[in-house]
Amino acid sequence: MDATMQTTKHEYQFEGAAECGYPPGRTGLSPAAQLPGAAAAHSLDMQPYSHLDDSLFKPPTPGSAPPTASTCAGVPSSAPRRRPRRLRPPAPLHYDDYAPPPPYSHDHHHHLEQGGGGNGAASRCTAVRLQQRRAILHQRSRPLRPAAALDRVRRVSELRQQRDTGGRIRRERAEGWGSPCRLSTRGSAAPSPAPAGARSAVAGRIFRVVNDIYAAMGIHNMFIDADLGGVITPGFGLGKVKGGRQAGVELTFMRTVELAEFFTEGRECVNCGAIHTPLWHRDGTGHYLCNACGLYNKMNGMNRPLKQPRRLMAAKRPGTMCTNCQTTATSLWRRNVQGETVCNACGLYFKLHNVNRPLTMKKDSIQTRKRKPKNSNIKADRSAKAVQRASPRASRWRAYWMRRRSPPRLGYYVQSAEGMKLEEPQHHVMYIGVPELGPDTRTRRTTTTPPCRSPAETSRPTPNIIIIISTFVVYICTCVIELPRSDRRRRRRRRSPPKYTFTRHDYI
């Protein structure tokens, strides 16, 4: 204690002298002592503290007791002095070495099937799985920014790899420049930068082909992630190209449809030669067939026949001439009853009328016409157009009621050579029958009338009458509802006092 006090006094004098600019060992005067005439006042003020200087800074005599608070204050101490209590040094802190928890595995509760008790282990496994699943769902539910897309895929893949255990990471080396194929099976024990991916040999073959293609383009480290939708995505970071350079672009996601179109490019149907089809088939020998040829071959057991245009058949028979009209140009060559070659016009005429076609009907060019729909009438169309032009408003009302009308019942009979046939009529077409195919009535048209309806159908009111009646009923109901309201208004007007009218005397 004495040595400490002596050292403290010495250091205090040394620091004070150094701060005042004096050499060590020489203390500077106080500001009060430096002023002229203030030295006496300073010494007078410091007299009450002289005993402190003696007790604190003077070395004590050997065998004397250490100074106390009472002696420092100038009060003689008569009470028994206590021995100061020694403080024990603090005990050193003890830190246990941190040991990471053991890796999660399912081996500790396989004895459940053997009849052992493992409820605690099973509950811990369930809790860990629920926690990992919640973490995955939380990562999926967060809003994704374009810059953090790859980071999110990496985090999800790491969580899935931690969840799936008992498997192994399978690494394959792709062909080409030897870039590693980052394919991992489900159940990798340690986290890896490659996500959990394809689990079949087909996906591995597809990956190798795609990796070779992109390796030729200078981009490596591609992987297939079947858990993320079966798409092909680039590896994390930029892949290395041949020569140690870095690829300057990152590939975007490629859809499975685009991948399928890429791998089916270059196929051709061996039957019809088609190169585009929604689905490719194979025949018995393994050759590719388009969808139409493949279905025909599967249903009929033979290749689908190819139809050739009929107009090209005349060019394949040069020198052929019609025996009736001596023409050499026709869309289709026919044979008559005697087996002679005739043109298309003469053959059809003889087939319809059983007589040869007269030469006066011969045309210099082939007459082509548009096929008209069945049961069509030109006059009906013309009359409808004339009515629309004459009265547009009436035509609009007519179209409105035609749309509101229910479709007619099935059934009116049409005469034909085969018998009676049931057909559904159209609204804007007249009922026209098919002529009998007799020799004398080939060109005659027979018009049939619609079948008679039952009395219940004929007595049914028309839509016009129904609308008129409904409108009248609504009007009557509206009037009945409005009458009490008008009576109330009239009564209120009668009960209200008359309004006061100002006269010229009120302003005086």
Curated annotation (Swiss-Prot):
<feature type="region of interest" description="Disordered">
    <location>
        <begin position="487"/>
        <end position="508"/>
    </location>
</feature>
<dbReference type="InterPro" id="IPR000679">
    <property type="entry name" value="Znf_GATA"/>
</dbReference>
<keyword id="KW-0010">Activator</keyword>
<keyword id="KW-0238">DNA-binding</keyword>
<keyword id="KW-0804">Transcription</keyword>
<dbReference type="InterPro" id="IPR013088">
    <property type="entry name" value="Znf_NHR/GATA"/>
</dbReference>
<feature type="compositionally biased region" description="Low complexity">
    <location>
        <begin position="186"/>
        <end position="197"/>
    </location>
</feature>
<feature type="region of interest" description="Disordered">
    <location>
        <begin position="364"/>
        <end position="389"/>
    </location>
</feature>
<feature type="compositionally biased region" description="Low complexity">
    <location>
        <begin position="66"/>
        <end position="79"/>
    </location>
</feature>
<feature type="zinc finger region" description="GATA-type 2">
    <location>
        <begin position="322"/>
        <end position="346"/>
    </location>
</feature>
<dbReference type="GO" id="GO:0000981">
    <property type="term" value="F:DNA-binding transcription factor activity, RNA polymerase II-specific"/>
</dbReference>
<keyword id="KW-0677">Repeat</keyword>
<protein>
    <recommendedName>
        <fullName>Transcription factor BCFI</fullName>
    </recommendedName>
</protein>
<keyword id="KW-0805">Transcription regulation</keyword>
<dbReference type="GO" id="GO:0045165">
    <property type="term" value="P:cell fate commitment"/>
</dbReference>
<dbReference type="GO" id="GO:0000978">
    <property type="term" value="F:RNA polymerase II cis-regulatory region sequence-specific DNA binding"/>
</dbReference>
<dbReference type="GO" id="GO:0008270">
    <property type="term" value="F:zinc ion binding"/>
</dbReference>
<dbReference type="GO" id="GO:0005634">
    <property type="term" value="C:nucleus"/>
</dbReference>
<keyword id="KW-0479">Metal-binding</keyword>
<dbReference type="GO" id="GO:0000122">
    <property type="term" value="P:negative regulation of transcription by RNA polymerase II"/>
</dbReference>
<feature type="region of interest" description="Disordered">
    <location>
        <begin position="178"/>
        <end position="197"/>
    </location>
</feature>
<feature type="compositionally biased region" description="Basic residues">
    <location>
        <begin position="487"/>
        <end position="497"/>
    </location>
</feature>
<dbReference type="GO" id="GO:0045944">
    <property type="term" value="P:positive regulation of transcription by RNA polymerase II"/>
</dbReference>
<keyword id="KW-0862">Zinc</keyword>
<feature type="region of interest" description="Disordered">
    <location>
        <begin position="50"/>
        <end position="122"/>
    </location>
</feature>
<dbReference type="InterPro" id="IPR039355">
    <property type="entry name" value="Transcription_factor_GATA"/>
</dbReference>
<feature type="region of interest" description="Disordered">
    <location>
        <begin position="436"/>
        <end position="460"/>
    </location>
</feature>
<feature type="zinc finger region" description="GATA-type 1">
    <location>
        <begin position="269"/>
        <end position="293"/>
    </location>
</feature>
<keyword id="KW-0539">Nucleus</keyword>
<dbReference type="Pfam" id="PF00320">
    <property type="entry name" value="GATA"/>
</dbReference>
<keyword id="KW-0863">Zinc-finger</keyword>
<comment type="function">
    <text>Regulates the expression of chorion genes through binding to gene promoter elements identical to those recognized by the GATA family of transcription factors. Isoform 1 may act as a gonad-specific trans-activator while isoform 2 and isoform 3 may serve as ubiquitous transcriptional modulators.</text>
</comment>
